[in-house]
Regions:
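Basic polycationic patches enriched in arginine
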Residues: 8-9, 20, 25-29, 33
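Short amphipathic, helix-prone segments within low-complexity/disordered or flexible regions
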Residues: 2-4, 14, 18
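Alpha-helical and His/Cys-centered functional microenvironments
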Residues: 11, 16, 126-128
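Intrinsic structural disorder
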Residues: 1-8, 42
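HIT superfamily nucleotide-processing domains
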Residues: 30-171
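Intrinsically disordered, low-complexity segments enriched in small/polar residues
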Residues: 17, 21-24, 47, 52
Length: 171
């Protein structure tokens, strides 16, 4: 059996199940960084979990079903991502689109990466219907104040995403 101390030197604590987390110097040694969500996204959204391509958030306003997918990257623009990461996040976007259409009955899904107000790369995946609060206008800048999701509504949506999109909890 290999002692934990030896394993600890060769494997970052982010993937170890035992031992203390790596400090700042340890993360730098392994080129690891702590994921930090932009404050505006923290204010506007409920965290749901993690997909292969990044963190999944839910916009607080129930007027439309609006997901925000945030890749764990320093890149500012979608097309600046390495090909593998771009493919991963696009696959997540497609899975969310299929979920919105098939499980939530939205006839249209808007997909966008704008980033003018929030510089952290994030993608908007929004379920749309002619009956929604902004139709046919885009949701950006046109969304009226609306009620926030309740905890039971968030948990129901989270469970559906676990089943249909392989949503994972965030560590």
């Amino acid at each position: 059996m290999v002692p934990a101390k030896i394993i600890r030197r060769s494997i970052p604590s982010a993937i170890l199940s035992v031992g203390r987390p790596l400090g700042k110097r340890g993360r730098a040694r392994y080129n690891l960084r702590v994921f930090t969500l932009h404050p505006q996204l923290q204010t506007d959204c409920h965290p749901l979990g993690k997909l292969t391509g990044g963190r999944l958030l839910l916009h607080r306003n129930t007027a439309v079903t609006w997901f925000i997918l945030v890749p764990e990257t320093k890149a500012a623009d979608l097309l600046d991502l390495p090909e593998a990461q771009l493919n991963s996040i696009m696959a997540d976007g497609r899975a969310l689109s299929v979920f919105l259409k098939n499980e939530r009955n939205f006839p249209k899904v808007n997909f966008g990466a704008i980033g003018n107000l929030v510089p952290q790369l994030h993608l908007h995946i929004v379920g749309r219907t002619p009956e929604d609060a902004c139709w046919p206008q885009p949701v950006w800048g046109n969304l009226p104040e609306g009620p926030a999701y309740t905890e039971p509504e968030i948990e129901t949506l989270r469970n559906q995403l676990i089943e249909h999109c392989d949503l994972q909890p965030v560590d």
